Design a protein with these regions (language model features):
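N-terminal alpha-helical transmembrane segments of multi-pass membrane transport
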Residues: 1-82, 92-99, 110, 416, ...
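Transmembrane helix-loop junctions in multi-pass membrane proteins
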Residues: 4-5, 35-40, 83-88, 166-176, ...
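Membrane-interface loop-to-helix entry segments
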Residues: 24-31, 35, 39-48, 173-180, ...
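Helix-loop-helix module between adjacent transmembrane segments
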Residues: 32-33, 106-131, 138, 142-174, ...
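Flexible loop linkers connecting adjacent transmembrane helices
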Residues: 38-66, 90-100, 112-146, 343-363, ...
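Alpha-helical membrane segments and immediately flanking helix-loop junctions
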Residues: 59-94, 120-138, 142-144, 155-161, ...
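Selective recognition of specific alpha-helical transmembrane segments in multi-pass small-molecule
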Residues: 109-117, 203-218, 229-249, 282, ...
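Extracellular/periplasmic helix-exit of transmembrane alpha-helices
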Residues: 115-125, 129, 239-257, 265-272, ...
Length: 468
């Protein structure tokens, strides 16, 4: 049994992330960028104008659908999470300052990957028995590639459903409970026995909240995400900017460190001299993927419910999503840490303590502890919401609507389990399946790349179309 567990958490995890996902992200991102004429760069202004530029306009959705904004905030709910805070901190600690450069590179290519995922999701979605729009990799495989390729969609759903209990549930609940404990300990340190009871109470409360929202369907998830995601993101951005500009003299040197060590991690010497280039590249690319999920295909499930007639217009939200998540929020986390001048123990895995120390340079330790704890709590909560939808849709595709209800009940129970138990092995196995999701998704993306290119050409470049 131990050998099987080691295979899933070690060998298979390395193969999935290092030898499959990362090369597919680079090669696939470049290929899709070329086929679609680099619209994430050439039409970036148009994409922002028609996504973030419309955020505060009143939108209404038809039956069985959510507004485009609710769709993107539901997807962002799952992606803007602990990866933006803890993941970015780990990228720097384990890969050096230069890891931020590779995080950016993966995001620039990831914008086109997620654009393609969302575009295909709208193009090949369908109505379920309740009349709701459903879509994602399993549906663009089924309706785009035909019955001989259905095994690819089935594989995706199996991998995603298993991963939802780890990356989308237990790890996030652990973050919430840990954050609440940190916030309480900043004022009233709790004894071990009291902590266990508190964790159980927290788990029950979180499970109840998730249950109320989850059983309300995609519309309720979208309505909650639409309100929570922008608010929590804006507050985090504001406080990060205060720290960065509070150390304004370090902004230039911070960028200098990032670029100087992107290809030569040992350039600055000191504690970072033990970091190899491979570590810098791998941790930058991997943490970018953890943060924005481009290539995993998960966000396409949320976007499929959008009330829109244009696959390309919704696809633009995929570009915005990666930009907001990684280029903006992850970059601000990185600059907050580097500009603050806090000590970094390179080569050692870190949690939230690095970003907490950075915020403490401006706001003091007590406030910083509470703020980071609350930020992690909200980010993790919305991630659970997003992944509860992803897992539910995958189980629905495999077994039907009735069984998806059973999954939802199990998902809520696992929330309580995740609050009181440390299930590192289960989390590590789920992390492996999270990486495996990319395999069927990239098969479909490559096979249907011509469809995306055709839709993009018709929308942006055909002379008989309106000028965009």
């Amino acid at each position: 049994m131990e050998a099987v567990i080691n295979f899933f958490t070690g060998t298979l995890n390395t193969v999935a992330w290092l030898y499959i996902f990362l090369p597919c992200t680079i090669v696939g991102g470049l290929y899709l960028t070329i086929r679609n004429r680099g619209i994430q760069f050439t039409r970036f202004g148009y994409a922002m104008k028609n996504t973030v530029g419309k955020m505060f306009q009143k939108q209404e959705a038809g039956a069985g659908a959510v507004t485009p904004l609710q769709a993107v905030t539901t997807a962002l709910a799952a992606t803007v999470g602990t990866g933006n805070i803890v993941g970015t901190s780990q990228a720097i600690a384990l890969g050096g300052y230069g890891a931020v450069f590779w995080l950016w590179l993966a995001a620039l290519l990831g914008m086109m990957i997620k654009y393609s995922e969302v575009t295909l999701s709208i193009r090949y979605r369908e109505r379920d028995a309740k009349g709701d729009w459903v879509g994602g990799p399993m549906y663009y495989v089924k309706n785009g590639l035909g019955k001989h390729w259905q095994w690819v969609g089935v594989l995706f759903c199996v991998f995603a459903a298993i991963a939802s209990f780890g990356i989308g549930n237990m790890s996030q609940v652990n973050s919430i409970v840990g954050s609440l404990n940190d916030a309480i300990d900043a004022f009233i340190p709790a004894a071990e026995g009291e902590r266990k009871l508190l964790n159980f109470v927290f788990g029950v409360v979180i499970a109840a909240l998730i249950g109320v929202i989850l059983f309300g369907g995609i519309k309720r998830i979208g309505a909650v995400a639409e309100k929570l995601v922008p608010v929590m993101s804006i507050f985090y951005i504001i406080f990060a900017l205060v720290v960065i500009f509070g150390h304004v003299g370090n902004i230039g040197p911070a960028f200098g460190k990032i670029f100087a060590t992107a290809f030569t991690p040992k350039a600055l010497g000191g504690a970072a001299s033990g970091i190899a280039l491979k570590q810098t590249i791998v941790w930058g690319l991997r943490r970018s993927a953890f943060s924005n999920e481009a290539g995993l295909g998960s966000a396409a499930i949320a976007h499929a419910a959008a009330d829109t007639k244009s696959p390309v217009q919704q696809g633009l939200y995929g570009i915005f999503e990666v930009f907001a998540d990684t280029i903006v929020i992850c970059t601000l986390t990185a600059l907050t840490i580097i500009c603050s001048g806090v000590d970094i123990t390179f080569g050692q895995k870190v949690g939230s303590e690095l970003i907490t120390a950075a915020f403490a340079t401006m706001f003091g330790q007590k406030f910083a502890s509470v703020f980071v704890a609350l930020a992690l709590m909200l980010f993790a909560f919305t991630t659970i919401l997003g992944w509860s939808l992803y897992g539910s849709r995958c189980v629905q595709y495999l077994f039907g609507l009735k069984v998806s209800k059973v999954y939802q009940v199990l998902f809520i129970i696992i929330v309580v389990v995740g609050a009181v138990a440390s299930l590192d092995v289960v989390w590590d196995i789920a992390d492996t399946f999270n990486g495996l999701m990319a395999i069927p998704n990239f098969i479909a993306l490559f096979a249907l790349s011509g469809v995306v290119a055709k839709l993009t050409k018709e929308y942006f470049f055909d002379k008989n179309k309106l000028t965009k």
